[in-house]
Amino acid sequence: MSAISLIQPDRDLFSWPQYWAACFGPAPFLPMSRDEMDQLGWDSCDIILVTGDAYVDHPSFGMAICGRMLEAQGFRVGIIAQPDWNSKDDFMRLGKPNLFFGVTAGNMDSMINRYTADRKLRHDDAYTPDNVAGKRPDRATLVYTQRCKEAWKDVPVILGGIEASLRRTAHYDYWSDTVRRSVLVDSKADMLMFGNGERPLVEVAHRLAMGETIDQIRDVRNTAIMVKEALPGWSGVDSTRLDTPGKIDPIPHPYGEDLPCADNKPVAPKKQEAKAITVQPPRPKPWEKTYILLPSFEKVKGDKVLYAHASRILHHETNPGCARALMQKHGDRYVWINPPAIPLSTEEMDSVFALPYQRVPHPAYGNARIPAYEMIRFSINIMRGCFGGCSFCSITEHEGRIIQSRSEDSIINEIEAIRDTVPGFTGVISDLGGPTANMYMLRCKSPRAEQTCRRLSCVYPDICPHMDTDHTPTINLYRRARELKGIKKILIASGVRYDIAVEDPRYIKELASHHVGGYLKIAPEHTEEGPLSKMMKPGMGSYDRFKELFDLYSKQAGKEQYLIPYFISAHPGTRDEDMVNLALWLKRHRFRLDQVQNFYPSPLANSTTMYYTGKNPLGKIGYKSEDVVVPKGDRQRRLHKALLRYHDPANWPLIRQALEAMGKKHLIGGRRECLVPAPTIEEMREARRQNRNTRPALTKHTPVEHQRQGLAANKKRGKGAGR
C-alpha cells in the first residue's frame, strides 16, 4: 500500500454545485451548429470551445474531455471545430457565449502539425477529415483568439492546449529562428491555462458563473495572466541576473516584531501573570506565496545565456508540491504564471474517463476518415504524466512528473464499452498505455520527497531510490483485460521505458508472452554518451539487458519477436563522429531504419534551449559554463539523418564526403567493417559531369551580362593605356 501523498487539492473536481443548465442533461454530441442547439432546446451556449482539430467525441481528444467535463458541471458547451479563419463569421455561428471562449490549436502544435523538422511543408493533417492539409492556420492559437475578439469584444478568451501551454513564457521559435513573446501577450487573450486543464477550467467556469469577472480571477493554479505588478501578499525572489538571486521584499522578523537595541539600563523584574495559551498557525512552507522574477523578454531575446538561465528556472518549478509562481516582464507589464495544478486523484481520473463520450467523430463528418481517430479508436489511455524527463520532450512541462493513474475497474469498463459499442471492433485492443507504457501506478514512495523534489528526472542518471518500480499493478491489469469475453488480443503500442522494465523482469515476461504483435517499439534515441547525456537517456547497457530478457521470454513463449529501436539525429550534443558510431552500431546489429527523425526544436524543451543558446540548462548556467555542440545548418542535419539510413544508396555520396573529411576513409569499401561501399566507376563519372555543369551561385554582387562586357572593355582600355 503506497503512502498517502502530501500533495492534495483544496477540493474535489466534482464537488462544485452544478450550474443551473444541468437540467438539459448531456448532449448526444456537443453541438457544432445552431440547428443542433435548437434540437437540444438551448437558446445560447455558456461556453464555446474553438479547436484546430476535427471534433471527435473521444477521451484522447482534448476538446472532448474539456467539453464533457464542463457539461458534467452543468454548463452548455458548443464546439467550433476548424473554423474558416479568414473572417470572424465562422466564429459567430453558435452565437455569443455567456461566459467565455476556450481556444486551442488542437492536440498538436499547429506549427509542428504543418511543418517537418526541416521546415518543409507537410501535405497531410491526421486530425482533419480525409487527412486534408491546410484546415488550420499557422500559430492557430493567435489567429483564433484574434477572430474571437473581433466577433465579441467583451467575451473573455481563455487559451489552452499544447501550443499555448509550451508558449507561456518568452520562448525560442524554431520556424522564425527568433525569441518570441509569451503567446498570452501576442494573442491579447484574457487567461492561459497550461497543462491538463480540468481543475483550472472547472474553477474558472464556476467563478465566472457566480459573477466574478475574468480580471478578478488571478489565483487559480495552472493559469497565466497579465499583471502590472506582483499579486498582493506574495514575496519575490529576483533572478533576473545570473547566480545572484535575491529577495525583492524585505524579510519579515521571525517573531513578528522588531526588537529595539539594548540600552544597558537595569530592568526591574516584572511580576509574572498567567497568560492565555494560544495555538500558533503552522509555519508557511518556504515556497508558499513566493514568486521568482525571471529575466524579461527583452533581456532573454538579446542574451542567450540569460535565456538558458530562465529556462533552467522554469523547468525546476514544475512540481506542484513545491513550485513557486513565475513572473516575467514583457514591455511595461508582466506575465504571471501560477504554480501547477494538483494532479488528479485516481477517483477523479475515473470520473473524467467515465463521462458520456460517443467515442466516434461528430456525425457532420459523414463517412470521412480521420487518421488520428483511426489510430486510437481501439486504444485506451490508462495514465497521464511521465517522470522520465527527457530533454527533447515536453510531456513533463505539460502533464507533469507525477503519474495520474486510472483504477483497474475504470479501464476494464472502457474495454467493455469499446467491445460493445464501437463500430468495427474485431476483438483487438490496439494499446493500453499513455505517454509511457509501463509507468502505470508507479510513484514516489516517499511523500516528503514527492512534495519537495526538484529533480528533472526520476530515472536519470540513475533510478531514484524513492521511485517505485514494482510493475505488479500493470501485470494484474494486463491479465484481467486478457480474460474478458470477446477480447482476442491486448497489444501494447506505447513506448516501453526499458530502464524501468529491467528492474522488474516479470513485466518483460508478461509483455513478451502475451502483448507484442511481432514488433515492440522502444527508444534508446542514441548509442553515444555525448548526446545521451544531453537527452537525459540511459546508456546502452539498459537496452542490452532489456533485449536479452525480451529475446529469452519470447523464445520461451515460442514466438519470433523483434525490437524496433527509435533514434534521433542532429540532437544537441551530437558530433559527426557520434552519428558515425551510431550508424556502425546499426549495421552491426543489422538494423535498416525506414523512418528516421531529425531533432525538432519544439518550444520550452530543454533540448531546444541547448539548440538555441549552445548552453546546457541541465547544469549551472554562466557565461563560462559548459558549451554544447549543436548540429546546425541544412548540410549537417542532412548528414546526421543520412547516417541513420546508411543503407540507402541515395545517401552514400554525402556519407563518403563526410567520412573523408573526418579522416575515416577506412570505413568506405566492401569490407564487413565498412559503412558504405566505394563509389562505382559510373558514379565517379556522374559526379565529374555534375561538377562540370555547375556554376557559382549568383548573388546581388554578381555582375549581369552587360556589366561583364563593360568590365572586359575597361580592362582592354586599361591595358592599352599602359603601353
From Swiss-Prot:
Signal peptide: none
Stored Pfam families: DUF3362 (PF11842), Radical_SAM (PF04055), Radical_SAM_N (PF08497)
Compositionally biased residues, Basic residues: 714-723
NCBIfam families: SAM_YgiQ
The protein's name: UPF0313 protein YgiQ
Binding note for cofactor: Binds 1 [4Fe-4S] cluster. The cluster is coordinated with 3 cysteines and an exchangeable S-adenosyl-L-methionine.
MF terms in GO: 4 iron, 4 sulfur cluster binding; catalytic activity; iron ion binding
Binding of [4Fe-4S] cluster, residues: C386, C390, C393
GN (gene name): ygiQ
Domain Radical SAM core, first and last residues per copy: 372-650
Similarity comment text for this entry: Belongs to the UPF0313 family.
Cysteines paired by S-S bonds: none
